[in-house]
Amino acid sequence: MIKISRKQYASMYGPTTGDKVRLGDTNLFAEIEKDYTLYGEEIKFGGGKTIRDGMAQSASTYTNELDAVITNAMIIDYTGIYKADIGIKGGKIVGIGKAGNPDTQDSVNEAMVVGAATEVIAGEGQIITAGGIDTHIHFISPTQIPTALYSGVTTMIGGGTGPAAGTNATTCTPGKWNMHQMLRAAESYAMNLGFFGKGNSSNEEGLEEQIKAGALGLKVHEDWGSTPAAINHALNVAQKYDVQVAIHTDTLNEAGCVEDTMKAIDGRTIHTFHTEGAGGGHAPDIIKAAGEPNILPASTNPTIPFTKNTADEHLDMLMVCHHLDKKIKEDVAFADSRIRPETIAAEDTLHDMGIFSITSSDSQAMGRVGEVITRTWQTADKCKNEFGALKEECGENDNFRIKRYISKYTINPAIAHGISEYVGSVEVGKFADLVLWKPSMFGIKPEMILKNGMIVAAKIGDSNASIPTPEPVVYAPMFGSYGKAKYNCAITFVSKIAYDCHIKEELGLERILLPVKNCRNITKKDMKFNDVITPIEVNPETYEVRVNNTKITSKPVEKVSLGQLYCLF
């Protein structure tokens, strides 16, 4: 038997079981738990390599030949951290394991035959993750979509109609006409999209109309009046049509305090946006909601991780996004009530404890649409550096923490909004929304983004160069983003009632439309690696946060990982 060193093996086929990989310039190390490829039978494309006719590429005719295979990929997912080939057919993941030619190789997965029909994407030395899911989008500008895509986000859920005052402040697409217009606009993009209707109404017929018009859920926002009545009516309609309700609660406590909101919610499942409160919500103690079993708590990315500049930058953001005036003292007091360093300091720690379940952006409305993934990993790194390894870790690695944090922007938002059957993880049967990263660039600069198995965006060099790599290397849309291909590379998520009533045909849409499902029968316990339920207390005078009588806080950092080292500007 021929043996080679681990270093030589990794340089040829990527790391294998027991190897550790550093994520970007963070202090996080992922260790491969299992290698599903077969030593000596690895498949690899290139001159003198194995994917050639009659070798690792079958010369026989198989009906299950793959459309594409990602070879020797290191997968980081809530399901595990492991090495495998990924087989793609018809836009979906059909196999994870050993791909190749069953006529000449052992242990080839019968669903993963490489043949004349198969394109090869080299995964050696790359990390593969599921595409990110951002569930807090203000659709203020369509230019957000490529920015998010180039960061590794493949699904955007939110509301709005453009740079209107209502959209600048709230994630709502109000009414049937606006909803239909946004569904039509979605046709232009190789990005999964879904839209919230406006959930603030004591008239349930108006809410139902929006669900029937194609809304995948409702958003209740304080700028429209997050009253107990509005909350109750929105949840009534959501229960009826199996959609999710997202909420931005009442900062000013005009219609009630956090206890009144929880009473109106009445144990029903709801997705709470920016649950820390700087982005909005009952001052000073909306953060208490994060510990409840029916609350799916999320953060928006300006407050994570907590840095020396976090509190200062929030005041100006708030004045702009919520149509406030610095010359009006009541507006300034409103802004000041939301920016509390004590609760912001607790937020990172609550994420690390698995109490906060989801991260999102709040795009252009106190949030950065291209930084969900980056800030999630910055927070993970900050917490490791401050608090050390989690007690759940096994061995000299950070695998548990890594699974906890990747779940926050992949599987958990998918579960929360009823789309986890389709996207949110690297699993057989799901659409192949996948992101490839060099380990050194992990979390900030992806190499390539696949939607439904086709490359829709990637880093690419000078188009007039003789090879693909010369500078300037920039992100650009790829063929999956063009022509009619984009209709098969992206999904619009709608309510089941709209899907069943053939909204696609009614509006003449060409994209894939799919219904959300199982939004109402989930709880915090369904949040992967982030399901901790515990009482949280907030001191109303000092804003100190406590869990089990222990003060929860963290220090503001002077410098973050995945920062200026990777960015010219």
Swiss-Prot record:
Compartments where located: Cytoplasm
InterPro entries linked to this entry: Amidohydro-rel (IPR006680), Metal-dep_hydrolase_composite (IPR011059), Metal_Hydrolase (IPR032466), Urease_alpha_N_dom (IPR011612), Urease_alpha_subunit (IPR050112), Urease_AS (IPR017950), Urease_asu (IPR005848), Urease_asu_c (IPR017951)
Principal subcellular localisation of the protein: cytoplasm
Induction: By nickel ions.
Originating gene: ureB
Active site: 322 (proton donor)
Cofactor(s) it depends on: Ni cation
One of the GO biological process terms: urea catabolic process
Record-listed E.C. numbers: 3.5.1.5
Domain Urease: 131-569
Gene Ontology cellular-component terms listed: cytoplasm
Name under which the protein is recorded: Urease subunit beta
